[in-house]
Amino acid sequence: MTNKTITLNLGPQHPATHGVLRLILEMDGEVVNNADPHIGLLHRGTEKLIEHKTYLQAIPYFDRLDYVSPMCQEHAFALAVESLLECSVPRRAQFIRVLFSELTRILNHTLNIGSQALDIGATTPLLWLFEEREKIMEFYERVSGSRMHANYFRPGGVAEDLPEKLLEDINKFIEQFPSKLNDIENLLNENRLWKQRLVDIGVVSQKDAMDWGFSGPMLRGSGIAWDLRKSNPYDVYDEMDFEVPVGKNGDCYDRYLVRILEMYESIKIIKQCIAKMPKGQVKTDNPKLTPPTREKMKESMEAMIHHFKLYTEGYDVPIGETYKAVEAPKGEFGVYLYSQGGNKPYRCRIKAPGFAHLQGLNFMSKGHLISDVITIIATLDIVFGEIDR
C-alpha cells in the first residue's frame, strides 16, 4: 500500500487566513507535511510610491501597511526623518506619541486575541473586545479626525494638540479596561478547549526564533526578553516603568499570554504618560517643518506662501541615510531612508515583522493537523498590508 499525499489550496479567500494568504498544503490525511505560503496578492508598490511623494505626503502610506496598528508605523517614519534632519521633538509631543503607540498596541492585541478565539470557535471574546476597540477608535477620531488611517504623527511632533477632556476620557477607559481584560482571561486562560487547541501547538524554540528573525510577541513567547522600548528606547520610553512579559514554551498558548500581559503593561505606560504629560508645544519650532498658524496666515502674505509651499513642495532633507525601528505590536517595524538632499526620499525600505513570521509557518505547521494550521496563522498575527506592501 502506498502513501499518497494530497495537495490542498487554502485561501486566498478563506476568512481564517487573515488577509489574502494563499497556502499550498501538502497533506497526508489531515496531517500537514508541507505548507508553502504564496504572498504578493496585496502588493501595491508602497516603497516605490513613497519615492514620488514629499516627506509629508508619504505619512498616509504608513497607515495603510499594518492597518490594525497604524500610528506605530507613522512613528517609525517620523523618527527616521527626524534622524536625517537632526531636529528635536517637544516633550509634550513625545509623550503624546508614546501614549498613542500604547493605545495602538491594545487596539492590535484585542483584535488578535478576539479573532484567534473566533477562528477556534469562540465568538464571545471577539464581541467583547470589539466593544473596547471601538472606544480606542473614538480616541483616534477625536485626535486626528479618522478612525483608522490617522495621519497624526509628524516629523518634529504631531499634527495637532489633544482636544479638551481627551486625557480624562482615556484615563476613564484604562481604569475600566483591566476588568474587561480579566473577564477575557476568565473565559480563556483555563478553558479546557482553548488549552487543547493552543498548548504545544506551533512550538518555536529560542534558536529557531532567532534564526528566523522573529520579533515582538513571537520572539518573547519563546522566552527571549527583547523589546526595542527597553533595549533601544525612543521618545520618552526610557522614562517609563514597565516589564517585558516572556513565555516559557514558545507555543501558541504562551504567545497568547504574552499579548494579554503586554496589554496590562501598556495600561501602566498610558497611566504614566497621563500623569507626567507636560504643557507646551506639540510641533518643533523649526519653521521649515512646521506650518504657520491660522492667525499668522490672516496677517502675513509670507506666512500664506510658506504654508502653500510646505504642503506642495515640502522641505529638503540633508543627504544621508538612516534606519529607525519601533516596537510595533507585531514586532520590530523598521524604516530605512536614503536622502539625496531633495524634498522626496531617494529610497524608502520598510521592514515588516509579519514578513519574517510568515516564513516560519512551514516549520511551525509540520506534523500538525490542518485545524492547527489555522491556530498557528492566528498566533502569527499577520496583516498583508505590511507583508505585501
Swiss-Prot record:
Lineage: superkingdom: Bacteria
GO (cellular component) term, any one: plasma membrane
Membrane among keywords: yes
Reaction catalyzed: a quinone + NADH + 5 H(+)(in) = a quinol + NAD(+) + 4 H(+)(out)
Top-level EC class: translocase
Key words of the record: Cell inner membrane, Cell membrane, Membrane, NAD, Quinone, Translocase, Transport, Ubiquinone
Cellular location(s): Cell inner membrane
Family statement: Belongs to the complex I 49 kDa subunit family.
SUPFAM superfamilies: HydB/Nqo4-like
Cross-referenced PROSITE patterns: COMPLEX1_49K
The name this protein goes by in its record: NADH-quinone oxidoreductase subunit D
GO terms of molecular function: NAD binding; NADH:ubiquinone reductase (non-electrogenic) activity; quinone binding
Assembly and oligomerization: NDH-1 is composed of 14 different subunits. Subunits NuoB, C, D, E, F, and G constitute the peripheral sector of the complex.
Encoding gene (name): nuoD
Recorded topology in the membrane: Peripheral membrane protein
Principal subcellular localisation of the protein: membrane
Source organism per UniProt: Rickettsia typhi (strain ATCC VR-144 / Wilmington)
EC number: 7.1.1.-
